[in-house]
Amino acid sequence: MFKILRKERLAPGINLFEIESPRIAKHAKPGQFVMIRLHEKGERIPLTIADVDISKGSITIVAQEVGKTTRELGTYEAGDYILDVLGPLGKPSHIDYFGTVVMIGGGVGVAEIYPVAKAMKEKGNYVISILGFRTKDLVFWEDKLRSVSDEVIVTTNDGSYGMKGFTTHALQKLIEEGRKIDLVHAVGPAIMMKAVAELTKPYGIKTVASLNPIMVDGTGMCGACRVTVGGEVKFACVDGPEFDAHLVDWDQLMNRLAYYRDLEKISLEKWERERRMV
């Protein structure tokens, strides 16, 4: 059992949980994730480790309420317990000195780029962070990213805050200004990461994407998270989650992400009905 030490509502439908787990906190590296299961009847879902506090023996995860499990997680409060937290899993991000690194986070992906941006900055890189949100009310962790970045650009789809448009518009502007970019690291919706990859490829800019396919066990046994990278089948949980964005078969990934959408909807509706009956 893993105790929730702190819960914070970052934005509508987006929750931060600080979870007591000294072992994971001690061994976690930027880019890695955990598999959580709320209770014995719950499913396992992957969540990226957004921060660690070794002195407190805690890890921080940020989850958006999009399905049954994340909605149920959203009802948990500080003092509650999560049955299973397995990790750290996945290969850590490749942290090195590259020069100018552009970190791109879309939605909850903003939380996921934080530890990587921090590590890249500590390596001496010039870090530009692009944070993308649908609207002003969903903006979070801007100050936190500013603390580990040399520049921060916030975009909103509707123009209610920061630059109007998508993260790719901000990246395109940097490229058009002639900024030398040595690495782009993107985390967010698959459609966003695909757009980033398509934008950087003609310029030969090395681009890494952290993939978020369906996962069941997180150890490479089930094969649910398989993705095609450079024509080869990879398991995101053990071979990734980060891959060369120019080699990912994005259309296949997005098709697989939509495969269980109807079942996920049924599961959520069932949970909501049962919750109303309590």
From Swiss-Prot:
Residues 1-4 form a propeptide. Its main location: cytoplasm. Residues 1-95 form the FAD-binding FR-type domain. Binds 1 FAD per subunit. Keywords: 2Fe-2S, Cytoplasm, FAD, Flavoprotein, Iron, Iron-sulfur, Metal-binding, NADP, Oxidoreductase. GO terms for cellular component: cytoplasm. Its cofactor is FAD; [2Fe-2S] cluster. Optimum pH is 8.0 (for polysulfide as substrate) and 10.3 (for benzyl viologen as substrate). The keyword Iron-sulfur applies. It is found in: Cytoplasm. Its EC number is 1.8.1.19, 1.18.1.2. A bifunctional enzyme that catalyzes the reduction of elemental sulfur or polysulfide to hydrogen sulfide with NADPH as electron donor. Also functions as a reduced ferredoxin:NADP oxidoreductase with a very high affinity for reduced ferredoxin. Exhibits a broad specificity for various physiological and non-physiological substrates with varied reduction potentials such as methyl viologen, benzyl viologen, FAD, FMN, methylene blue, 2,6-dichlorophenolindophenol (DCIP), cytochrome C and ferricyanide with highest preference for benzyl viologen. Heterodimer of alpha and beta subunits. This is Sulfide dehydrogenase subunit beta.
